[in-house]
């Protein structure tokens, strides 16, 4: 294929890199051959109150799945992210906050953050929150969201952060499932110039009669627009901290005490409350952050993720703060008020490391050079991609345009359930190939298996499994260990099943091919939708594409492609033929789309993932039950797609 673009390690990166190719080989071998020795040493990246003696105690055996790391050690996460830095870098910036409005920004030092966290931890105690209680956090992207999370960790409460874009029903469901005792929210959030009615959504959610555990709602004042107020239940953040002491000793926590619950949608049923514990998670978040981003003291790091997603937990807050880093928190979106906003923020704050998602990259790519207009971006040293496989064209555009053809891209594959990076390049140790997540991180043992669980050696394609545990691994699903075993360990016995497919090339590099339910079987041949989408998006007139399979009476499945064109382009019969021939040329006749569906927008969740389940149903005409659409950023897109489908004259 024309899309395999190799990029060597730049000399400027190699010179100062924390991990070289030789070090990677050495550490990786040690980490899989002697995990106790390797992780016993690496566990020291954080401070322990009582040091651990036992490192790894894990089992993936059917019916006995149990994951424990550093289980006899004790620590406090907030002390690791704050207190231990005060002597050396108390006056250093911990968080740079950039508002939705380009004229609003501020910095918070480690000393200030420590003070605010201690105060708010005492507020939580005064409201009756105890060690082990669950606190729901439904906040905008403001430093107070970090304060709330760290304050929970300081006193041993378990936080359940709910993304600010979720509906009242979704909020209610998460509060009920987790038995949350308290809700922390804001009057409103601000995103792309629009107000998000957070408090109103909480009020609506709390009308659910099944919610009996909530005593108080703490409200942070972001805009000053809180309409409804329930005396006795609702309390202002600013009123509470006025009275609060800034002296709050950190609670001593066992390594296996729960740190947070984070809900993630399953392919079936209600969202799953993924549980991460304190010790192994923090060791893994800190170690992966340090080495994957090749973090050097003083680097300014920007992860564009919201705190409501696992990326926001591990790589906006906990990983960076545990390492004493400077982390940038952005309230806005990459293309507001202008399409060059992301580039402007990079220049304004002299960002050295940028971590964002393919969805954002593709949206900017559709704007062409306008996305970098009037900016230099010459402070950038490392860039990263997260959330879904990045197609080689978007990778190259990101590399050449945003990164001025000099920044290695760490294309990271991982999941809510893995806690941290699993397969990823290391800037000073890995030659890059556009579109490949490359190699496993230390201690991660991936394998490819066929549908019967037989290992596929060498160059192969198959289901991506992990054969042994790692410290950042989720321990269970909240209140449902049976579902945890069923979801992740029953498909392939004795292995963690990721739900993703991958192929391994001749260099041992992994290429994620998409969810396994996004695999097409055309005339007995397996085709990953990501591969076809990649070819489509490589066409100069196409901005975005999503591919699904529809039943075909001869081939088994036909290929149905939803396509969004770049601004200014119009669909024509000529373009229809041209696009089909283009894919035929890029991948081969088998991959030629049978049906093209032109559309202005695709149904996406608020985190930017394309909702393929809905696209499959629309494509097959099965619209009787589209399932839960509450997580869609814009539900009206579905109606539009249905209308388009009805009016389509598809060539047979």
Swiss-Prot record:
The modification N6-acetyllysine is found at residue 609. Its EC number is 6.2.1.1. CoA binds at residues 191-194, 311, 335, 523, 584. ATP binds at residues 387-389, 411-416, 500, 515, 526. GO terms for cellular component: cytosol. Acetylated. Deacetylation by the SIR2-homolog deacetylase activates the enzyme. GO terms for molecular function: acetate-CoA ligase activity; AMP binding; ATP binding; metal ion binding. Transmembrane segments: none annotated. It is an enzyme of class 6 (ligase). The keyword Repressor does not apply. This is Acetyl-coenzyme A synthetase.
């Amino acid at each position: 294929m024309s899309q395999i673009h190799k990029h060597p390690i730049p000399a400027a990166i190699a010179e100062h890199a924390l991990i070289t190719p030789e070090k990677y080989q050495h550490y990786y071998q040690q980490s899989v051959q002697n995990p106790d020795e390797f992780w016993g040493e690496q566990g020291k990246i954080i401070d322990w109150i009582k040091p651990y003696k036992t490192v790894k105690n894990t089992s993936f055996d059917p019916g006995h799945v149990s994951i424990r790391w550093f289980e006899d050690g004790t620590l406090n996460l907030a002390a690791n992210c704050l207190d231990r830095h005060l002597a050396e870098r108390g006056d250093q910036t911990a968080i740079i906050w950039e508002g939705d409005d380009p004229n609003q920004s501020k910095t918070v030092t480690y000393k200030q953050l420590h003070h605010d966290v201690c105060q708010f931890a005492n507020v939580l105690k005064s409201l009756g929150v105890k060690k082990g209680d669950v606190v729901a956090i439904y906040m905008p992207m403001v430093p107070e969201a970090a304060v709330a999370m760290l304050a929970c960790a300081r006193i041993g409460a378990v936080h359940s952060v709910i993304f600010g874009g979720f509906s009242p029903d979704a909020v209610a469901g998460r509060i009920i499932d987790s038995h949350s005792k308290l809700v922390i929210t804001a009057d409103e959030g601000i995103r792309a110039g629009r107000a998000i009615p957070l408090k109103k959504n909480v009020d609506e959610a709390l009308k659910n009669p099944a919610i009996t555990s909530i005593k108080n709602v703490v409200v942070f004042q972001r805009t000053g627009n809180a309409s409804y107020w329930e005396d006795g239940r609702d309390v202002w953040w600013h009123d509470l901290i006025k009275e609060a002491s800034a002296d709050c000793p950190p609670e001593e926590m066992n390594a296996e005490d729960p740190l947070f619950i984070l809900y993630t949608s399953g392919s079936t049923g209600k969202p799953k409350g993924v549980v991460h514990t304190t010790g192994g998670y923090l060791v893994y978040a800190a170690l992966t952050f340090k080495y994957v981003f090749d973090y050097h003291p003083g680097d300014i790091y920007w992860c564009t993720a919201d705190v409501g997603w696992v990326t926001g937990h591990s790589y906006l807050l906990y990983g960076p703060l545990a390492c004493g880093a400077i982390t940038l928190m952005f309230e806005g979106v990459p293309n507001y008020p202008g399409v060059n906003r992301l580039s402007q923020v990079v220049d304004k704050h002299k960002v050295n490391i940028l971590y964002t998602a393919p969805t954002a990259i593709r949206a900017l790519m559709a704007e062409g050079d306008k996305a970098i207009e009037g900016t230099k971006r010459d402070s950038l040293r490392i860039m990263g991609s997260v959330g879904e496989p990045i197609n080689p064209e978007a990778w190259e555009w990101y590399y050449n345009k945003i990164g001025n053809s000099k920044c290695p891209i760490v294309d990271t594959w991982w999941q809510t359930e893995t806690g941290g990076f699993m397969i990823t390049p290391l800037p000073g140790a890995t030659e890059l190939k556009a579109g490949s997540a490359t190699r496993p991180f230390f201690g991660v043992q991936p394998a490819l298996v066929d549908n019967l669980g037989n290992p596929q050696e060498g160059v192969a394609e198959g289901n991506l499994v992990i054969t042994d545990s790692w410290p950042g691994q989720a321990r269970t699903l909240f209140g449902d260990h049976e579902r945890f075993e069923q979801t992740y360990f029953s498909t392939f016995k004795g292995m963690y099943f990721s739900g993703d497919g991958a192929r391994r090339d001749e260099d041992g590099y992994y290429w994620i091919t998409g969810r396994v339910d996004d695999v097409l079987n055309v005339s007995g041949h397996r085709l990953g939708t990501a591969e076809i989408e990649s070819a489509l998006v490589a066409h100069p007139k196409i901005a975005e594409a999503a591919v699904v399979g529809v039943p075909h009476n001869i081939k088994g499945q036909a290929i149905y492609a939803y396509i969004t064109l770049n601004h200014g382009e119009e669909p024509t019969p000529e373009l229809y033929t041209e696009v089909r021939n283009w894919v035929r040329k890029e991948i081969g006749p088998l991959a030629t789309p049978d049906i093209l569906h032109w559309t202005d927008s695709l149904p996406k969740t608020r985190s930017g993932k394309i909702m393929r389940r809905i696209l499959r149903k629309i494509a097959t005409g099965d619209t009787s039950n589209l399932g839960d659409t509450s997580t869609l950023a814009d539900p009206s897109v579905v109606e539009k797609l249905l209308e388009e489908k009805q009016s389509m004259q598809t060539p047979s």
